[in-house]
Amino acid sequence: SRKAVQALNLFGAEHCVGDRAEQDYTGKVLVLSPDTLKESCWSQENQLWYAHDGFGCSPHTIGRSVRCTCLGDGEMTRWNRNEFIGVLDDKFLPEWAKPKLAELQAQEQTDAPTMGGMNMK
C-alpha cells in the first residue's frame, strides 16, 4: 500500500536518477523495491544496496544477477536487476549510509588490482 510506504519514508522512483534501462549499476547505490522485501523488513536501511558486480549490473546483458552489499547491515547477497527501483540520487543518501558506502568503495579500489582471473561462480 502506498500509504504504508510513505509513512516509513521509503525510497521510491522519485529518489532515483538516470534512465534505468540504460544505466550500468556497477559501484552505484541502488534502491531495492519494497515489493521485493517482506513488509516487516520495510525500512530505508534494507532498501539501500551497493552494487559490486554481476551480469545484471549492465543494462544490455542476458544475466540479471547483481552482487551487492546492504548499506544497512552489511549483508552481501544477489538480487535481480529488476528488483531495484533504480540508482539513488546522491543528494538523498542518508548520513547513516555514508561511512558504509565509503568503506565499500575503498574496498573495491583495493580489491580491483588483485582480481586477475574473473572468478565466476
Predicted regions and their residues:
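Intrinsically disordered, low-complexity, charged/polar segments
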Residues: 69-109
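Mixed-charge, Lys/Arg-rich low-complexity intrinsically disordered regions
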Residues: 1-38
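Extracellular, surface-exposed passenger/stalk and repeat segments of large secreted bacterial proteins
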Residues: 1-4, 26-27, 33, 63-76, ...
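Generic N-terminal leader/processing signal
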Residues: 1, 26, 96-98, 117-119
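Composition-driven detection of intrinsically disordered, low-complexity segments
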Residues: 8, 50, 112-114
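Intrinsically disordered, low-complexity, compositionally biased regions/tails
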Residues: 16, 22, 31, 58-60, ...
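Basic/aromatic-rich interaction segments and small domains that mediate binding to polyanionic partners
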Residues: 34-81
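Non-Sec secretion/translocation targeting segments of pathogen effectors
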Residues: 106-121
